[in-house]
Amino acid sequence: MYRIVCALLLLTPCAGAQTGHLLLRKPALSGTQIVFSYAGDLWSVAREGGDAKRLTTAPGVETDPVFSPDGSTIAFTGEYDGNVDVFVMPASGGVPRRLTYHPGRDAAVGWTPDGKRVLFVSARAVPNDGARLYTLPVEGGGLPEELPLPIALEGSYSADGSHLAYVPLFQWQEAWKRYRGGQTKKIWIANLADSSIVKIPRDNSNDFNPMWAGDRIYFLSDREGPVTLFYYDTKTNKITRAIAKHGLDFKSASAGPGAIVYEQFGELHLYDLKTGQTKAVAVTLAGDLPELRPHYVNVAKRLRNADISPNGARAVFEARGKILTVPAEKGDPRNLTNSTTAMEREPVWSPDGQNIAYLSDESGEYALDIVNEVGTGEAAKIPLGKAFYSNAAMVAGRQEDRLPGQPQSPVLRGPRSEEASVGGD
């Protein structure tokens, strides 16, 4: 019925180098540099920050970088040959070399303390939603050796290689904040000689990303609210919060010589293991990033939250955070919002067919925006307060009244019969 819609995303690319909240992911730390994933590629920057250097440029995604103990080599997860496998490359850059060849997904996790083998996770021998940890010689050759653990995902060796701190449970909904169901993550410490374990104490919190440093096992946890850094002392069996809660979750972290690098709100930070002090790492990115250029995107398969105009002539959709209308028969598609920094959701047509209401987070909190169905002029904005709204039709109540003396000024009523003027002064 409706024709395919192609929407021009009017992005605003940076004219020069980029700084600030760049969504720098999965950082790894050596004695001199930090390697991280950005826009599907690996980048390197000095520990003190500065201009980042691009290490990979393949069409697929490269992520999960981990430094060898001497800092000379990086193991990472890549998609160079149409499959997700483990690769290694010099820390200074170079041609990646493939280590794993299983048709399933293999992902880099770490290194053995002697730097001779790469630790990786794979579901190659585990049914359902499980996985196991394996090691493979960094020089290649031979078969992967499976660690003696039934299910294991993330892992970090003790200095002598005799023990491993690991996560023994797969969690399918990792982004569920403050989840307290049956799949909360935990960290166990395994004696690799006999597979006996010690459980790091917790009260059904999500503990993950273990990092062994000296006699301590550092890890990320939401046991006190937002995810931050804690450590477990293997000598005293006590748990201490290393970094105070900041309100924003830490997403990943990696231990290196004398410090831990972690990502928070798209930025990188260093935690000094001796002083306990933290500092932000200022990173500047400059490169050819096609994703930042304005480009056409076919959104025919991404249309959602549809509504039909009262006369049936057009339909409105949400697609990639934009509000679009398309004709039933004749006419052109219309991008009503054309925004670059906001998410617009849940469009609904007014009963008279003249306006379209939708939810927008342009101000930082969701507001009810109303624009004429042609998309011309500024949208009227109705603040909704600091609450969660998921349906513009529910907020609007599908009711339209008129202000006294202003017959062309619609009023939308909220669920508590609160009135908000849309078209009047």
Label the model's feature ranges.
Residues Q18, S37-W43, A58-E62, A75-F87, ...:
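A flexible loop/linker signature enriched in serine peptidases of the S9 family
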Residues T12-C14:
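N-terminal signal peptide c-region/cleavage motif recognized by signal peptidases
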Residues N298-D307:
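Signature of short aromatic-glycine-proline-rich micro-motifs recurring in repeat-based ectodomains
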Residues T19-G49:
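Mature N-terminal segment immediately following signal peptide/propeptide cleavage
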Residues A52:
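Glycine/alanine-rich phosphate-binding loops at beta-alpha junctions
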Residues L29-G31, P69-D70, P113-D114, A159-D160, ...:
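Residue-level detector of Asp-centered blade-edge/turn motifs that repeat once per structural unit
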Residues M1-A7:
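Sec-dependent signal peptide recognition
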